[in-house]
Amino acid sequence: MSEKRVEKKLIHYVKKALNDYRMINTGDRVMVCLSGGKDSYTLLSLLNSIRIEGNYKFDIFAFVLDQSQPGWDDSALRGWLDDKKIPYEILTRDTYSIVKEKIPAGKTYCSLCSRLRRGIIYRYAEEQGFSKIALGHHRDDLIQTLLMSVFYNGQIRSMPPKLLSDNKRHVLIRPLAYCQERDIIKYAMEQQFPLIPCNLCDSQKNLMRQRVKRLISDLAKENPKVPSNMLRALSNIKPSQLMDHELWNFRELNVD
């Protein structure tokens, strides 16, 4: 697939997600969380292209959190943002030391790291008056999270395309919700984004997500529709076919 075709495909699915879930309204100030990885770069690049087209009237801003990880170098990232004329701020907060101190060797860092990062993001968005917080999770993240929740937490849940935060102060959006990771990888390579590796995540390759990712990949080899069917299942819930008493009144279920 050519560079333009990949970009066109991704933009199509981003616009579909924006419209399906009314993610961005006219006049919104959208804060895109840029981690330095392929997903967040792709999200920012595509949203910026859509903004430039002019059919969606919103402002865009890149928020970068420097978590004081060893080897962090954002000079190329700054250059890329300057070249694209995207306003941004790089905020330094040493969450790396906290995570390394609190989490025993061999355990997963992601949960604590995410909580610390989320708190900083929420505070910054509120202080600066942003109406939407855009995250770079894609289709594969959504379906992997579904299985991880079932297998390891005993819950049927995932990452919704649009979410009101627990404190009711922030609206989070995931415009890449319909986009496949393989297309994002291709697009990121073509765009030659100056990626910044995560020394925490990249040092833990044998995590639950990697195992679930392999499982879905293996199933997709037998049936290519497995990933798309899983995504479709997230919007095709049948409460009466499950066991949640809060969703369905089983105790009072009788023949009239």
Curated annotation (Swiss-Prot):
[4Fe-4S] cluster binds at C110, C113, C201. One of its GO terms (molecular function) is 4 iron, 4 sulfur cluster binding. A motif (PP-loop motif) lies at residues 35-40. Transmembrane segments: none annotated. It is found in: Cytoplasm. GO terms for cellular component: cytosol. Its cofactor is Mg(2+); [4Fe-4S] cluster. Homodimer. Catalyzes the ATP-dependent 2-thiolation of cytidine in position 32 of tRNA, to form 2-thiocytidine (s(2)C32). The sulfur atoms are provided by the cysteine/cysteine desulfurase (IscS) system. This is tRNA-cytidine(32) 2-sulfurtransferase. It comes from Coxiella burnetii (strain RSA 493 / Nine Mile phase I). The lineage of its organism: Bacteria, Pseudomonadati, Pseudomonadota, Gammaproteobacteria, Legionellales.
